[in-house]
């Protein structure tokens, strides 16, 4: 049966499908709750109420119950070019969205409705990619792609969730991505190539919310992206690419990894075919025992 995802910005490979999956943090009880072979679905968030996930497909935002029922689109008005960087407010009432075409941030009620622009207009290019929200719901953390073509830089910022001035937390030439607040608000977790000795060698880090006190959390030869902290603040799940990977592309043999919040050990949860879209945003369940991701297996 064809899926309802009629808008498509990126195509699956021949024989490939998108599998929205829930798994225990120890790698057990893997449950595919949605599988489609005609569309790319990406980047689940788990609603704080625990009953459903939200994800993006074809520039739109969708929701589905954790048992795989109740698939429906969340109305976002005139913004329908949404990428896979979105977060939910701690109270579960609002979803904050990154729109690809204009590079701006918006908020929409979780039930759907008219979007409200959160981000600012800039005299020079400043494309917003959203990743985190403070535990009190007042501040968003994001990366901005800044500068003209050929001189682009990716740095970390915060902005009030209700709109207001951007606050720069990094001003560097190497890539940074995925800034996400810890549940106690004391840290921002992120990925960076700040210590790379070869192109693309991103690792996991954390820093204080003012940009100080940077600590490295992974020291792998592999390429590690998007550390997502659990709601109880004890563990992170992140995605790990083979050495030599540039950025976080799709259609790669990757691993989902688990580490404690201080990075003192690292363990593989599951290996899969995926990458971009698999786990770009925080997808932990409220109980901190499970999380969601998308795999993209090629079946034939």
Predicted regions and their residues:
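Sequence signature of WD/YWTD-type beta-propeller architectures
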Residues: 1-300
């Amino acid at each position: 049966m064809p899926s309802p995802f009629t808008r498509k910005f990126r195509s699956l490979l021949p024989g490939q499908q998108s599998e929205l999956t829930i798994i225990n943090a120890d790698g057990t009880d893997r449950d595919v709750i949605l599988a489609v072979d005609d569309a790319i679905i990406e980047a689940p968030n788990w609603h704080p109420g625990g009953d459903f996930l939200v994800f993006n497909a074809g520039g739109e935002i969708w929701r589905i119950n954790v048992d795989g029922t109740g698939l429906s689109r969340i109305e976002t008005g005139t913004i329908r070019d949404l990428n896979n960087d979105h977060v939910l407010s701690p109270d579960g009432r609002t979803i904050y969205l990154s729109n690809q075409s204009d590079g701006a941030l918006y908020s929409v009620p979780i039930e759907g409705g008219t979007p409200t622009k959160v981000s600012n207009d800039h005299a020079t290019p400043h494309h917003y990619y959203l990743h985190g929200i403070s535990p009190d719901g007042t501040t968003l953390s994001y990366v901005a792609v800044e500068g003209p073509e050929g001189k682009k830089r990716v740095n970390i910022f915060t902005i009030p969730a209700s709109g207001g001035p951007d606050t720069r937390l990094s001003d560097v030439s190497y890539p940074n991505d995925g800034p996400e607040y810890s549940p106690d608000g004391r840290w921002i977790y992120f990925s960076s190539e700040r210590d790379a000795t070869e192109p693309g060698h991103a690792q996991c880090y954390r820093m204080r919310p003012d940009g100080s006190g940077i600590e490295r959390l992974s020291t792998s030869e592999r390429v590690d992206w998007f550390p997502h902290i659990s709601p109880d603040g004890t563990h992170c799940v992140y995605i790990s690419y083979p050495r030599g990977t540039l950025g976080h592309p799709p259609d790669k043999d990757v691993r989902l990894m688990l580490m404690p919040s201080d990075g003192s050990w690292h363990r593989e949860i599951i290996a899969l075919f995926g990458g971009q879209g698999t786990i770009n945003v925080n997808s932990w369940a409220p109980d901190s025992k499970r999380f969601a991701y998308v795999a993209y297996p090629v079946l034939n």
